[in-house]
Swiss-Prot record:
Free-text remark on how the cofactor is bound: Binds 1 NAD(+) per subunit.
Encoding gene, per UniProt annotation: ahcY
One of the protein's GO biological processes: L-homocysteine biosynthetic process
Family of this protein: Belongs to the adenosylhomocysteinase family.
SMART domains the record matches: AdoHcyase, AdoHcyase_NAD
Function: May play a key role in the regulation of the intracellular concentration of adenosylhomocysteine.
One cellular component (GO) term of this entry: cytosol
Organism: Rhizobium etli (strain ATCC 51251 / DSM 11541 / JCM 21823 / NBRC 15573 / CFN 42)
Lineage: Bacteria, Pseudomonadati, Pseudomonadota, Alphaproteobacteria, Hyphomicrobiales
Protein name: Adenosylhomocysteinase
Pfam families: AdoHcyase, AdoHcyase_NAD
Binding site for substrate: T57, D132, E192, K222, D226
Catalyzed reaction equations: S-adenosyl-L-homocysteine + H2O = L-homocysteine + adenosine
Length: 466
């Protein structure tokens, strides 16, 4: 492990390999490269000190270097202990950006690294957060609440919360008052994923959100592309790399049929699996049924299916009682943000055999075994390398525009959660059309007036669902 200077990566010697893959990814990320061309000279992020907590992949490296090209200073950690690509982290560290990320890092190190991305060499403070899942934001807000005398650290509900609370207490002891100062210095946060967005909305509803936030996840060019088309390619990739199992003919259960569930079901179906769906929402259940999937109760298929994938963003979706009933060598994995969709903690007292990194064989007393991927964390990033560069370009272009929006317009946004305006959503889509050879039909003035839009757009109302 290399710990010199202001970074922690697995092997700085991987930097050249990482740089080669970054160069390839740049050709597949036209949105980010267009942002560099459009904003690089003006440097709208000059003065921004961005704390980034997002999967440290090759694609994220292109995002980081785009933010730097636009004038920002950046410190970065991964938002998942298994999602880092070590050569990507090495390349970014070698380029002079402080990064703290190792594939397979411990939970203790994860929260130490989350603390480090707020610790600037000159003792200054971050003024922007770019988050995925909300951990960096929650770290600061929990610490500030503790400094205010609230009893928020005395009752951890999980092993991870216990570790998080210990790290907060360590920083409280070392730097009294720091959390409050850091919270007050933040101009805004941009949030990448459904889980983190839900956290922000809950804070906003309670009046506890201390700075403006942009919900990047619900930009159409994020949720309808990254969540759906990204999962459509990366889920099966992760299962194959982890298990080498043939999916054709297997029975696969997808828990949840939101955008991630839709992409996951399509991924498995495209590989030849016979897909069944579980769903609590009647609208999503009807969509699944009309897309041709059998919508079932998990309890009715748990002993007969071969593959189980959670996509819900909820907790305890697959519980230990379910896993006890699974057939021998059933594959269990998650593609939602956190690891609590599968009741992994309840499996810890069973016999675990590590097959290879992020693949574990867990044996129940009656002799049946399950294959657990990435310990219940994101299997497409733990067992594979996540979504392809092209679809991540759309997501990360939204992130870049959102960072510019909040940083350059202080005072224009209240302490609420916002979505990028429709014209920017359409702009992100436009930036990716040439790469695919797409030609847009041009509306005449008369046609545009007939449907109540401008010929150049936006073409849909904010409530249009796509």
């Amino acid at each position: 492990m290399s710990t010199e200077k202001d970074y922690v990566v697995a092997d700085i010697g991987l930097a050249d390999f990482g740089r080669k893959e970054i160069t390839i990814a740049e050709t597949e990320m036209p949105g980010l490269m267009s942002c560099r061309a459009e904003f690089g000279e003006a440097k709208p992020l000059k003065g921004a000190r961005i704390t980034g907590s997002l999967h440290m992949t090759i694609q994220t490296a292109v995002l980081i270097e785009t933010l730097v090209a636009l004038g920002a200073e950046v410190r970065w950690a991964s938002c998942n202990i298994f999602s880092t690509q070590d050569h990507a982290a090495a390349a970014i560290a070698a380029a002079g950006v402080p990064v703290f990320a190792i594939k397979g890092e411990s939970l203790e190190d994860y929260w130490v690294y989350t603390d480090k991305i707020f610790q600037w060499a000159d003792g200054g403070l971050s003024n922007m957060i770019l988050d995925d899942g909300g951990d960096a934001t929650m770290y600061i807000l929990l610490g500030a609440r503790a400094e205010a005398g609230e009893d928020v650290l005395s009752n951890p509900h999980s092993e991870e919360e216990e570790i998080l609370f210990a790290q907060i207490k360590k920083r409280l002891a070392a730097s009294p008052g720091w959390f409050t100062k850091q919270r007050d210095a933040i101009k805004g946060v941009t949030e990448e994923t459904t889980t983190g967005v839900n956290r922000l909305y809950q804070l906003s509803q309670k009046g506890l959100l201390p700075f403006p936030a942009i919900n990047v996840n619900d930009s159409v060019t994020k949720s309808k592309f990254d969540n759906k088309y990204g999962c459509k390619e990366s889920l099966v990739d992760g299962i194959r790399r982890g298990t080498d199992v043939m999916m054709a003919g297997k029975v696969a259960v997808v828990c949840g049929y939101g955008d991630v569930g839709k992409g996951s079901a399509a991924s498995l179906s495209g590989a030849g699996a016979r897909v069944k769906v579980t769903e609590a929402d009647p609208i999503c259940a009807l969509q699944a049924a009309m897309d041709g999937y059998e919508v079932v109760l998990l309890e009715d298929v748990v002993s007969s299916a071969d593959i189980f994938i959670t996509t819900t963003g909820n907790k305890d979706v697959i519980r230990i009682d379910h896993m006890r009933q699974m057939k021998d060598m059933a594959i269990v994995g998650n593609i939602g943000h956190f690891d609590n969709e599968i009741e992994v903690a309840a499996l810890r007292n069973l016999k675990w055999t590590n097959v290879k990194p992020q693949v574990d064989l867990i044996e129940f007393p009656k002799g049946n075994r399950i294959i657990l991927l990435s310990e219940g964390r994101l299997l497409n990033l733990g067992n594979a390398t996540g979504h392809p560069s092209f679809v991540m370009s759309a997501s990360f272009t939204n992130q870049t525009l959102a960072q510019i929006e909040l940083f350059t317009k202080p005072g224009q946004y209240e302490n609420k959660v916002y979505i990028l305006p429709k014209h920017l959503d359409e702009k992100v889509a436009r930036l990716h059309l040439d790469k695919l050879g797409v030609k847009l039909t041009q509306l005449s003035e008369e046609q545009a007036a007939y449907i109540g839009v401008k010929p150049q757009g936006p073409f849909k109302s904010d409530h249009y669902r796509y």
